[in-house]
Amino acid sequence: FKEWKNAFKRFINNIPFYGAAIICIDDPTIQSIISEIEDKKIITYGLSPQADFRATNIVFKDSKTFFSLEISPKKDASAKKIENMVSNIPGIHNVQNILSVCSMAVELGIDLEIIKLALLGFEGVNRRFSLIKNYKGIQIFDDYGHHPIEIKATLSASREITNDKVVAIVQPHRYTRLKLLFEDFTSAF
């Protein structure tokens, strides 16, 4: 684990002076690493109150995600809050993905209203929690998640958008992956 932390720090330290590291601060290990990095521009995102880009008031409804985007003040700017952000893809993990993209877009100088409109028009990626059919209130999704962590995230997103029963059908992708991660696969459900 120490090797992983050192590799992450080396990666951040290799960012050129004109670049920035956009990092999810929700993980305690990442929080400890950030405090050890000097002379690099760090932009954080996540659900944590310490994040530079933070989602609040998150609501999942009808396979959509609604939230507010809060941008913390920096030396050269004031705090901002963008209400009524809407995403067509559910799941806390997707909210975190959206926050990372918003962070990058703002860093590149893209207007917040353009970011909001782009998010509203984004339908997701094919076979990543794609709604295939809605039959008599039963929603059928397709997701290519083939790793236990991805499967857990998809099932979590499923449970966030319904109070009803969630049924998952899995097709193991690779024998060696299944064999090596069998315990993780069995606990993913």
Give the positions of each predicted feature.
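A conditional alpha-helix N-cap/helix-loop micro-motif detector
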Residues: 1-5, 148, 178
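Short, glycine-/Ser/Thr-/acidic-enriched flexible segments
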Residues: 92, 109, 146, 173-174
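Short, glycine/charged-enriched secondary-structure capping and boundary segments
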Residues: 1-2, 35-39, 154-156, 181-185
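Switch II (G3) loop of P-loop NTPases
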Residues: 140-146
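Conserved cofactor-binding/catalytic machinery of classical short-chain dehydrogenase/reductase
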Residues: 100, 146, 150
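Acidic, Mg2+-coordinating active-site environments of NTP-dependent enzymes
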Residues: 1-140, 163-164
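Active-site beta-alpha connecting loops in nucleotide-dependent enzymes
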Residues: 125, 149, 155-189
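Short, function-defining helix-loop hinge/capping sites that tune catalysis or transport
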Residues: 32, 105, 150-151, 179
